Amino acid sequence: MRSSLRTALAVTVVATVGIALSGCAGPGGSTGGGGDATSIEDALEEGGTLTYWAWAPSSEAQVAAFEKAYPNVDVKLVNAGSGVDAYTKLQNTIKAGKGAPDVAQLEDTAVPQFALSDSLVDLTAYGLDELEDQYTVGTWSAVASDGKLFGLPQDSGPMSLYYNKRVFDQHGIAVPTTWDEYVAAAKTLHEADPSTYLTSDNGDGLFASSLIWQAGGRPFQVDGTKVTIDLQDEGTLKWTSVWNELVENELLAPTAAYSDDWYKQLGSGQIASLISAAWLPSLLQTAAADGAGDWRAAPMPTYDGTPASANYGGSAQVVIKQSEQQALAAGFVEWLNNSPEGIQLLIDSGSFPSTTADIDSPASLDLATEYFGGQKINEVAQASGESVSEGWQYLPFQVYAQTIFPDTVGQSYANNTDLNEGLKDWQDALVKYGNEQGFEVVTK
């Protein structure tokens, strides 16, 4: 099983942003009554108060439904956000030994650093590891390793090509199945209408990592305290050979991603496609409503026409060791991500689930979306999830890595220059940072 945590779990502690590799987990909480499925049931019946840090759109509705099902439990929901600031705040409360939530939502990229710092409860104690077969391989391996389970997957992000059929038809562009065809389409479209771009990318570390993943790159390898970084491996160079064509020829829309103008251009067709994840459709429908009926979904282009994909985003719910209600917290996590009602509320909010039964269900696969011209777009996402390649690892300081991407590789985007030069700068900065945090970081 692929896992970003597999070999790294020989380390007992790890740096988070700005915190060196040292004992930083802080005092642990009690087990909340011992660990097994029975203790979860007993804890839910007895009740108590939980604090939950989350940002998912479904969180409020899920908490309300959970409290209705278990009236003796009071869940205090806090939208603490995500990203470096939120994770630094969480780590600081863990280190201080007080103030941490009982349950937190973590992006897949952040799970390793909290697992390695011994900050998370191993949910195998409550029998939740028995749920493995109910989740996709990629999402489960993001939270499980070496017989330990650090959370339950919630949403996932298998990647696809989302495109504006009206614009494609207007310019006689066939849906590209290879990256060479995608670059050719970008040139054709922009030459025909200089105000229109095939796609948008300002330089995002997570997005770039996902594209490298799909290309077969494995630039990050973790083995205990040893971290190997090779941002010039074969797969990474495959990606830059394609993306340099778009960057150096100024074929990427310069509009800032997720800005009002960006959504407006997606709605009008000035940005005619996006390589993105299964969570994109809900964003388009709400923020780029003018594109209704024009958009479609297709498999992600590949290098040789053979299906291949990657995950872009995804998150899980974890129980923080500081919690004094660990059994109750584990029960809440199980309800959120493994109960029919909890998962349905997630789906209703526009997120793509991690549970195979829900992904493969006729209700999901047969759902026709008017925004996408009546297409059953979940069929595309489901096939993408099945073609996610294994073997990918995130750095144990991945959150930090993404924060410095704009200052390194991002400069190549900004100046329309060779991405490989930016990747080398990124690698140098990561090696320096990792060694400062107590890892042995080497390059190939």
Briefly describe each language-model feature range.
Residues 241-328:
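Extracytoplasmic/periplasmic substrate-binding proteins
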Residues 169, 384-444:
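Conserved C-terminal helix/tail region of periplasmic/extracytoplasmic solute-binding proteins
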Residues 186, 226-255:
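Glycine-centered hinge/linker elements that transmit conformational signals in sensory
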Residues 148-154, 159, 183-228, 271:
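Extracytoplasmic/periplasmic solute-binding protein
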Residues 92, 100-102, 130-167, 197, ...:
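A structural signal for short loop-to-beta-strand junctions that line the ligand-binding cleft
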